[in-house]
Amino acid sequence: MNNFNFETNRTYAQSLDSQDDLAHYRSEFLFPEYKNGYSCVYLCGNSLGLQPKKVKQYLNEELDDWSKYGVHGHTKAGRPWLTYHLQARSGFAELTGSLEHEVIAMNTLTVNLHMLMTTFYRPNQKRFKILIESTAFPSDRFAAESQIRLHGFDPKEALIEWQPKDDELFIDDLQQIIAAQGDEIALILVPGIQYYSGQVLPMQEICQMAKSAGCNVGLDLAHAVGNIELELHKWAPDFAAWCTYKYLNGGPGSVGGAFIHEAHHGSAGNEQLLGWWSNDLESRFKMGAEFVAAKDADLWQVSNPPV
C-alpha cells in the first residue's frame, strides 16, 4: 500500500493541483459565483453537473439550422436531426463498455426504465416479483411499484427488498434472497452505485446470479455512468438506463441513455412499446402502414429525440 502524507496547508494543496492531469478541464465549465464574485467549490455533480462553456454555442447552432432549413433540417442540418441520436452512440458505448448497436440516446431515466420494463418485466402467476435494494432512489421504487400494480399484483407481495447492514449492501444477502425466492423473481433492478452511500455494487456478479436463477436483470446507472468504468456487454445485464445531467453535465432534463444487450435484438417488435422511431430508418419516412422493426437498440425508441 502506498503511503499518503496529508498536509493541511495551501502550499501542499497547490502542489496536488499541479500534479492533477485533469485540472485543465476545470476551465471548460461555468461555476456559480458567491456574492463576493468568487466562484464556488462545486461538489454537487452527483445531482446536477456544471454547464460546459460550449453549451450556448451548440444551442445556437441548432437554432440557426432550424431557422435556415425548417423541416429540411432533418437531413440538411449540420447535425441532421433524423440521425441526431446516433451522435451519442459511440460515446455511450465507450462510457458503458457496450457495443455501439446496444446503446441508444432517448427520453429520460425513469421513462426509459418504464420502457425497458415493458420488455423485461413480464410476470406470470409463478414468477412475478421485482427485487430492488431497500434504499433505492425513490423514482426507481415508484417505477417498480407502478409496474407491479399495472400487471395486477400487489407491491406488498411482489416487491422484495435487499436490505443493507451498517449502510452497506452485501452480496451474500442478495444470494440468500435469490436462493430462497429466485423462481418467483421476474426482475432484479439495482443501481451500479448506491446513490446515498456511494457503494459500487458488484454488477457482474449480480448479473451472473440473476441469470443462474432465471431472472431478468436491469441496472440503473445514474450515478455510475461517467463516474466508474463499466463493461455492460461483458457483464450482460438484460438492460440498463442512465441520465446525462450528473457526471455527463448534460443539463436539467437532458436526454437519457439506454442499453439493451444484443441478445435481445431479434425480438422484432413483439415485446416493447413501438412508435415511428422504432421503425427501420430506411422505411421510416415512407409512412407505410406496415411496421418494419429496427434491428438493434433503436427498436426501443418510440419518438424522435429532443434535439
Q: Residue ranges of each PLM-predicted region?
A:
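Pyridoxal 5′-phosphate
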Residues: 1-307
